[in-house]
């Protein structure tokens, strides 16, 4: 089988991610014999769920259902007492398995709107880094991949929307790479060691990635036609994944920041972990990762055991024992 041109990474840790919506919406947009694979990275992986995802795909595109790679924050190898948010690790799992030269990440609980795939194809053809637009709505009814009815919600408006242009992608800065779908050449992502798992348990992994890509010389685009609509109800259902954002006294914060080689704080605000994520990447001006105990380009599933043995027992920010989280 020939390698695909685009790998779509769909990561989820939900009992009900709404994959049928995404599968139907994507299939409606694909041309015949589209060179695409969809990789479902599943934090709840089991054989029964594989059958369910395969049934939703219904043979309309190549599908692979894979377990999320081990993480100190989520899954069977976790060091924490409960599952935490670990989107960076899940997306890096997709990069381990992706076979295409271009990778697009799509959030669960969402349906791609009619121009989404065309925007992905355009970005892939030009080798561009692109952020798609999103909206979050309630009371969604999706029929065969088409959003039939929904209710708009002020909390679900993409803050970049007015920056966009319906006719073409526009340039944005690295810190504006976030949201429900974004894409980039796989080799570019591997060259900066993927997403930084320093962000796991906290968040900001997409914004931090955008800043690091910009430091690596990439141009970041925003394509308003690459739109997905996310269900507020599905997104809030089930057991929430823990997110933490601990604070330190100012002096301790600045001492910890200096450990990363940053002596002047670039941001203002609370002295918490989420600010330090940004302070480190902005203060160093580097694309380097600080939370990945491996080099992603060399990582294969057979090497996960060595990675697990290097997992930390404490949180990088404040030294808190992960077992107490």
Regions found by a protein language model. Name each.
Residues 200-325:
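C-terminal catalytic/acceptor-binding lobe
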Residues 34-45, 64-70:
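Short beta-strand/loop segment that forms part of the nucleotide-sugar
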Residues 103:
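Short aromatic/hydrophobic "clamp" motif used to bind/position activated sugar donors
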Residues 51-96:
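Active-site-proximal specificity loops/subdomain of glycosyltransferases
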Residues 108-123:
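Acidic donor-binding/catalytic loop of UDP-sugar-dependent glycosyltransferases
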């Amino acid at each position: 089988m020939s390698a695909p041109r685009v790998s779509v990474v769909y990561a989820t840790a939900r009992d009900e991610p709404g994959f049928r919506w995404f599968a139907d919406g994507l299939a409606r947009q694909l041309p015949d014999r589209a060179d695409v694979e969809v990789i479902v990275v599943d934090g709840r992986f089991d054989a029964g769920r594989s059958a369910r995802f395969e049934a939703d795909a219904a043979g309309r595109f190549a599908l692979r259902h894979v377990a999320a790679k081990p993480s100190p924050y989520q899954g069977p190898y976790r060091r924490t007492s409960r599952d935490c948010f670990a989107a960076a690790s899940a997306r890096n799992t997709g990069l381990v398995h992706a076979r295409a030269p271009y990778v697009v990440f799509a959030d669960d609980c969402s349906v791609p709107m009619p121009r989404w795939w065309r925007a992905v194809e355009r970005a892939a053809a030009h080798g561009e880094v692109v952020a798609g637009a999103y909206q979050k709505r309630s009371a969604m009814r999706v029929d065969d991949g088409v959003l039939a009815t929904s209710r708009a919600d002020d909390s679900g408006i993409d803050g970049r929307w007015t920056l966009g242009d319906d006719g073409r992608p526009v340039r944005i800065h690295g810190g504006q790479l976030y949201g429900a779908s974004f894409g980039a050449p796989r080799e570019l992502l591997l060259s900066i060691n993927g997403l930084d798992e320093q962000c796991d348990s906290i968040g900001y992994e997409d914004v931090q990635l955008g800043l690091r890509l910009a430091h690596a010389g990439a141009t970041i685009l925003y394509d308003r036609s690459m739109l997905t609509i996310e269900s507020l109800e599905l997104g809030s259902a089930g057991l929430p994944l823990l997110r933490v954002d601990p604070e330190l006294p100012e002096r301790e914060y600045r001492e910890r920041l200096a450990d990363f080689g940053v002596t002047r704080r670039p941001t203002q605000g609370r002295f918490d972990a989420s600010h330090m994520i940004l302070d480190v990447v902005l203060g160093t001006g580097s694309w380097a990762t600080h939370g990945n105990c491996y080099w992603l380009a060399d990582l294969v599933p057979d090497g996960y055991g060595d990675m697990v043995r290097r997992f930390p027992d404490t949180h990088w920010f404040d030294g808190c024992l992960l077992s107490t989280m």
